[in-house]
């Protein structure tokens, strides 16, 4: 099957990611089915789509006629079988719980047409493991959108061990038709590209707070002052502290115990303070986006530390064959974050030797093996 053959897309899950992906499909001209387990979830997701389309009409990005046509192109369901029975492409967007994803894919495989491609929007988890629950592992692929799906350009297209080249190419071409920037992930590796490169910075940011070395506002103010649209702690809140927590647990199980979530983050989770989605997390979101006091900027904090950690992890992706080139990593990082600049592009401006030295110092100071510089970073021939 080619991308041109796709007429109807089913999205499983109507939450933040699910309804966003459904809207992306509508904007690209597809018929869409959106499913969730309770009517209230479906109605809330559909309501969010309507609100978003209304805003696009106000901004004159779509016409009112187009808005009505798109709303006429979406159906909602509670039953997975009904939602996917005539789909050409299905995208799962349920919470990051492996057992839940496996259950969903068993149901999709049983009910979807034989030609249909089954994609997971997982941000971290093994596509290969998910695919093993189906009788069509060659037609199972990772298709990782970023939040908010309508605005963010990056889509990671992840190859499981048995994913066919036809499935990869069709999914890549579908992302292009959705006006996204797809990046091929050639090896099913935990965290893929964007989240894998950023994951070690979560260790560092957590350690700074855990040890009382900084406050989140001091770092965010510093990063905002140098031009970042959002500081790293505010971004954690925006995505959801639960996502960071469970992602950390998964990385700890699959890659290194260094990723084990810190006590301060666990306390936030236990208190139900998950960030924007609950109105409170690291910051207070009850009145909208938190105000960051730029006068509290920690001026002696060197942003090169974060770049060093990211560049070091990015070299591991090259060494492991997760992607084919440094350019693909830079495309992912530039499109997924909002800075518009790739990790290696920034690293070259600072110097690989300096960054390797920073990583050595961090590994020694914090006792974190993940921070140890790779041979690729030391040599700098990237």
Locate the predicted segments by residue.
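N-terminal glycine-rich phosphate-binding loop for ADP-containing cofactors
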Residues: 1-382
């Amino acid at each position: 099957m080619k991308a041109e053959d796709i007429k109807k897309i089913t999205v499983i899950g109507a939450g933040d990611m699910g309804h966003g992906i459904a809207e992306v499909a509508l904007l690209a001209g597809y018929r869409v089915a959106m499913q969730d387990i309770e009517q209230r979830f479906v109605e809330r997701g559909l309501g969010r789509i309507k609100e978003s389309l209304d805003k696009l009409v106000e901004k004159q990005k779509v016409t009112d006629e187009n808005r009505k046509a798109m709303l006429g192109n979406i159906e909602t369901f509670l039953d997975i079988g009904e939602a996917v029975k005539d789909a050409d492409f299905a995208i799962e967007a349920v919470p990051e719980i492996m057992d839940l994803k496996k259950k969903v894919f068993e149901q999709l495989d049983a009910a979807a047409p034989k030609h249909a491609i089954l994609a997971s929007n997982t941000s971290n988890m093994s596509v290969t493991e998910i695919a093993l629950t189906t009788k069509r592992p060659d037609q199972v692929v990772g298709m990782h959108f970023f939040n908010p799906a309508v605005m963010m350009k990056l889509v990671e297209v992840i190859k499981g061990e048995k994913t066919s080249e036809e499935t990869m190419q069709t999914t890549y071409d579908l992302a292009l038709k959705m006006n996204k920037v797809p990046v091929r992930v050639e090896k099913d590796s935990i965290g893929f590209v964007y989240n894998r490169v950023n994951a070690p910075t979560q260790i560092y940011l957590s350690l700074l707070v855990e040890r009382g070395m900084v406050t989140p506002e001091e770092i965010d103010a510093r990063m905002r002052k140098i031009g970042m649209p959002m500081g790293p702690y505010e971004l954690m809140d925006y995505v959801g502290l639960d996502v960071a927590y469970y992602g950390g647990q998964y990385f700890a199980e699959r890659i290194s115990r260094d990723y084990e979530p810190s006590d301060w983050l666990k306390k936030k989770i236990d208190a139900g303070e998950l960030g924007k989605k609950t109105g409170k997390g690291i910051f207070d979101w009850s009145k909208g986006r938190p105000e960051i006091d730029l006068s509290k900027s920690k001026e002696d904090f060197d942003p090169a530390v974060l770049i060093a950690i990211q560049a070091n992890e990015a070299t591991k992706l090259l060494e492991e064959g997760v992607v084919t080139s440094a350019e693909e990593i830079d495309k992912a990082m530039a499109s997924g974050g909002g800075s518009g600049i790739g990790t290696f592009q920034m690293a070259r401006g600072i110097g690989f030797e300096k960054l390797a030295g920073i990583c050595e110092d961090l590994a020694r100071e914090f006792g974190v093996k993940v921070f140890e510089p790779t041979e690729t970073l030391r040599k700098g021939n990237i």
